[in-house]
Every structure is written in structure tokens, then in C-alpha cells.
């Protein structure tokens, strides 16, 4: 049986980096083919070739046995290919319906038939089991909702080959189950799917076959995962065995370093209070929409607080904007690193130095380039940031390496006291997670107070000294590490269970 999609000896080179080297594998109709590898292994680059964003320097792509060359994304779409990237592509000021039908809006004599467009979109969303308002502006939706729109857009094009790059990274459990059903339905319809994920549970739940990348090369292809243990996939991905990804070790904790009392804002149902000791890692867990990120933005000054007091080392501080927080040694690594974390057109070195630049000014006026170069090189080496050089534009780095650069930005701060990490390992492979946990522990050992927001319950349980659980815009409860387990945390997080019952 000929493959619906074949990659034949694909090669791609960027300045100083061989991103893909001799990649060959097949994807068949009615098959979900998993693609795994560390960040920077070349998975997303391959999808960009499939989607017409990049052209291969060697090899060829075959669809239904015929060689194809996509000079643009439009050419790929016209050939029945749909690629859903980790970096979402949407127009924030347009509605859900307008984004889904962009370029295909029904019209009469040049006038868009909005009623027909909304009706069509509503019918398709209902059929897919997706609960979204067709009139809602994309820019006002959550990241999870925007991701569902991207997935729906591909499905509405009736593509024969669909590639999904970390599609559940921002989805709730219910939304993930909706996606899984869609994938199962598409497989049953005979479509060919590529599914990139770092989550082993998803790979084993969805995929019929799996290919492993490492450093731009194919390490292995498995036609069936039935007899392949998870440990083997991890070893193939990272080139080494990782027995305990979290490697938690108790550490001495100091006095309360930071506290928030009665913090309130539009996204919260009731005022929230919490504290963090010096050297402590407090994990914040909750379902999508629980208000964790919103609470952190209020504390950091990114959004305006209606009420609440912040205390640092026993003294009340006034934080009305992010600059105030940074001056007090409080920093936040945001959930959406593409929009709020990195400066995409700047170099790796500039992204690392942007926050601490005020410390490298000579005579208060001139940037000390020598100091900045030394700082960038030190953190590139210490955090193992994969980049050809410090001058490389950060947008060309993988998600894991971008995240390491953002963490380097704050590690370079000499007066760092409080670090808020919002989904620090989202979309990052198991090897990079291991390294980022090392960074978090290093910050805690420096005496920093760490707040880690995460949707991955095993991560929260594995890394945190204490866990705060949020539910529907309020703090539902708190658990010490010794008391915490999946049942106890989920009992507090799930809407149908009261705090009293969970206790």
C-alpha cells in the first residue's frame, strides 16, 4: 500500500545549524503517526516544510506517491495539507467565524453574507463538539480557546493530511478529550495524521506508529507501540536514561519572603491571599479558567488590582505596574512566551540582557557591550541553550531553548527575590524539563521565593514544597508536600467537589 505522505531523505540547513539530516518515513491513510524528540530535534522544521513555510535543501515530499513542492502555505493548503503549529496563527480583531472562514467568506456581489457565515460556523462547531461563540473576538479568548479555533480551521478545510504540533499544550481536560475524539474520527475517515507531543500518555493513547528525532536525525521508527516501553522512547529521544525527571531534594527554608493579602481583580470570584518563604517553591494548580494566571498578573502589576496588599521581607510594597515589581526584585515568566516573553526579532544575547541592562550601563548612559557578551555566553553555556551563536535571532530557537533564554534573563538579575513561573515547561520535551527544574532549584537555593503555575499535576507534585489549588476564580485549598497526592489535589480542583468535602 502506497503511503498517503512520504518524507524521502529530507535535509534542511540554517546558518550554523543542520536542522534536518536525511529524514525519511511514511504516514499512511487512516493512521496517526506520532513524532517525538527533544526541543530543537527538527520536528517543527519538518512541519514547516510540509506546510510550505520552508523549502527543503535536499530530498522530497510525496503525497499519494507523487512528488510535491510547496512554495507557499497556500500551495500546501491547496494540496489538502493542514498544519497546525504550536505558535497559533490568527487575526485577533476578527471573530471566531471570520477567522475560521478567512479567505472563504460567503458573499454576494462582493458583500459578505455574515448571517450565512455564522450559521455555517455554528453548525460545524456543534458537529465537532466545540463550545465557542462565533461572534467572539479571537483576541479576547483564552489561549486554550484560540487553539481550538486553529484545530477547527484545519478540520473545516477537509484536509487529507493533518499535522498537529503540541495541540493539547493549552487545552483543559475536557477540551483534550474533545480533541482526542476528533483525531479518532479523522483516523476512521481515512485521513493521515502526524501528531507531535511530549506527553507519553497522548502518544500511547492516539498513535498507531511513532518516529523519534534527535539533533535533526531520525533515530528510530516504530510501526506499532504495543511492545515499545516508555523508557525506550525516552532513551531514544534524549540519548540517555532519565530515571527521576524531578530529582527533588528538601532544602532549608527561610522566613516569609513574599505575601499577597486580599488581592482582587475582575477574573477572581473572591479576594486571594498566599505567601511564599525564602527558598520555597509553591506550586499553583487548577483547571483551565481557575484564575491562576490572572492572579499572578495582578500580583505582578500586569493587570490592575481592585484591592490587596503585597509584602516583601516584612515591608509593604506598592506595585501598580510591572516596572514597580521588577524594581522590587519580583519577576514573571509569562504563560504565552511568544506574545509576552521573548522579543522575537532580537538576538539571544539581547533577550537575555534586556532586563538587567540597567546594571551594565557605564556612567549611567552607555551600554557595556563586553559585560553583556560575557553574561549571554555564561548563561548559554550554563543552561545549555542550543543556538549557533549569541547573535542568532531568538525566534529561530525551539520553544525549550526560548524558555531557557527567558529564565536566563532573570537569573542574570543580581537582586532577584521573587520568581513567578507561569507554565514554565509547556511544550517542552522531557530532557529540557529536567534542565529547567535544575534552574528552578538553583533559584530556590539562592533564597528566591518561587511561585510555579502549572497545568501538569505530576510536575506540581514532583517539584513543589507546597501546593495551592485554585478553582473557579478562588483559592480552594492548600496542601503540604507530605499531604499532597493526585486525589487530594483534584478533589480541591474539580468544580463538583466542595472544599469541605475535599478536606
Swiss-Prot record:
UniProt domain ABC transporter: residue ranges: 5-240, 251-497
SUPFAM superfamilies: P-loop containing nucleoside triphosphate hydrolases (SSF52540)
Reactions catalysed, as given in the entry: L-arabinose(out) + ATP + H2O = L-arabinose(in) + ADP + phosphate + H(+)
EC numbers for this chain: 7.5.2.12
Pfam family, one: ABC_tran
PROSITE patterns: ABC_TRANSPORTER_1, ABC_TRANSPORTER_2, ARAG
Residues that hold ATP according to the record: 37-44
GO cellular component, one term: plasma membrane
GO molecular function: ABC-type L-arabinose transporter activity; ATP binding; ATP hydrolysis activity
This protein's record includes keyword Zinc: no
Membrane-protein topology: Peripheral membrane protein
Main subcellular location of this protein, as a coarse class: membrane
Keyword Zinc: no
Alphabetically ordered keywords of this record: ATP-binding, Cell inner membrane, Cell membrane, Membrane, Nucleotide-binding, Repeat, Sugar transport, Translocase, Transport
Subcellular location: Cell inner membrane
SMART domains for this protein: AAA
Homology family: Belongs to the ABC transporter superfamily. Arabinose importer (TC 3.A.1.2.2) family.
Function statement: Part of the ABC transporter complex AraFGH involved in arabinose import. Responsible for energy coupling to the transport system.
Record's subunit section: The complex is composed of two ATP-binding proteins (AraG), two transmembrane proteins (AraH) and a solute-binding protein (AraF).
Name of the protein in question: Arabinose import ATP-binding protein AraG 1
Amino acid at each position: 500500500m502506497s503511503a498517503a505522505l512520504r518524507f524521502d531523505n529530507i535535509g534542511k540547513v540554517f546558518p550554523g545549524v543542520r536542522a534536518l539530516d536525511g529524514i525519511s518515513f511514511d504516514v499512511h491513510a487512516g493512521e496517526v503517526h506520532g513524532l517525538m524528540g527533544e526541543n530543537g530535534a527538527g520536528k517543527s522544521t519538518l512541519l514547516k516544510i510540509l506546510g510550505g513555510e520552508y523549502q527543503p535543501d535536499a530530498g522530497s515530499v510525496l503525497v499519494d506517491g507523487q512528488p510535491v513542492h510547496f512554495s507557499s502555505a497556500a500551495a500546501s493548503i491547496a494540496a489538502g495539507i493542514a498544519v497546525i503549529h504550536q505558535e497559533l496563527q490568527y487575526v485577533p480583531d476578527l471573530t471566531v467565524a471570520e477567522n475560521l472562514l478567512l479567505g472563504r467568506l460567503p458573499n454576494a456581489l462582493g458583500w459578505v453574507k455574515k448571517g450565512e457565515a455564522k450559521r455555517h460556523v455554528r453548525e460545524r462547531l456543534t458537529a465537532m463538539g466545540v463550545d465557542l461563540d462565533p461572534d467572539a473576538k479571537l483576541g479576547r479568548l483564552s489561549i486554550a480557546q484560540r487553539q481550538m479555533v486553529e484545530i477547527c480551521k484545519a478540520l473545516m478545510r477537509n484536509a487529507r493530511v493533518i499535522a498537529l504540533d503540541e495541540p493539547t499544550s493549552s487545552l483543559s481536560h475536557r477540551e483534550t478529550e474533545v480533541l482526542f475524539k476528533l483525531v479518532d474520527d479523522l483516523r476512521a475517515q481515512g485521513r493521515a495524521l502526524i501528531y507531535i507531543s511530549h506527553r507519553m500518555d497522548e502518544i500511547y493513547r492516539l498513535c498507531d506508529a511513532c518516529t523519534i528525532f534527535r539533533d535533526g536525525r531520525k533515530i528510530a521508527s516504530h510501526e506499532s507501540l504495543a511492545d515499545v516501553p516508555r523508557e525506550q522512547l525516552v532513551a531514544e529521544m534524549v540519548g540517555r536514561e532519565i530515571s527521576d525527571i524531578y530529582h527533588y531534594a528538601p532544602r532549608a527554608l527561610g522566613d516569609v519572603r513574599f505575601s499577597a493579602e486580599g488581592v482582587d481583580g475582575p477574573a477572581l470570584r473572591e479576594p486571594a491571599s498566599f505567601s511564599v518563604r525564602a527558598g520555597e517553591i509553591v506550586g499553583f494548580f487548577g483547571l483551565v479558567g481557575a484564575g491562576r494566571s490572572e492572579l499572578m498578573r495582578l500580583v505582578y502589576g500586569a493587570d490592575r488590582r481592585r484591592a490587596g496588599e503585597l509584602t516583601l521581607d516584612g515591608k509593604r510594597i506598592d506595585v501598580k505596574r510591572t516596572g514597580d515589581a521588577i524594581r522590587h526584585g519580583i519577576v514573571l515568566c509569562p504563560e504565552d512566551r511568544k506574545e509576552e516573553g521573548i522579543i522575537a526579532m532580537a538576538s539571544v544575547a539581547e533577550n537575555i540582557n534586556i532586563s538587567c541592562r540597567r546594571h551594565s550601563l557605564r556612567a549611567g548612559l552607555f551600554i557595556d557591550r563586553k559585560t553583556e557578551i560575557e553574561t549571554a555566553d555564561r548563561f548559554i553555556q550554563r543552561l545549555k541553550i542550543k543556538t549557533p551563536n549569541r547573535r542568532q535571532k531568538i525566534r529561530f530557537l525551539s520553544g525549550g531553548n526560548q524558555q531557557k533564554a527567558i529564565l536566563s534573563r532573570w537569573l542574570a538579575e543580581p537582586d532577584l527575590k521573587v520568581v513567578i513561573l507561569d507554565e514554565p515547561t509547556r511544550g517542552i520535551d522531557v530532557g529540557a524539563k529536567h534542565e529547567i527544574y535544575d534552574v528552578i532549584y538553583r533559584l530556590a537555593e539562592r533564597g528566591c521565593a518561587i511561585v510555579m503555575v502549572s497545568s501538569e499535576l505530576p510536575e506540581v507534585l514532583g517539584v513543589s514544597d507546597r501546593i495551592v489549588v485554585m478553582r473557579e476564580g478562588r483559592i480552594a485549598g492548600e496542601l503540604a508536600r507530605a499531604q499532597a497526592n493526585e486525589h487530594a489535589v483534584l478533589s480541591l480542583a474539580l468544580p463538583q467537589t466542595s472544599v469541605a468535602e475535599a478536606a
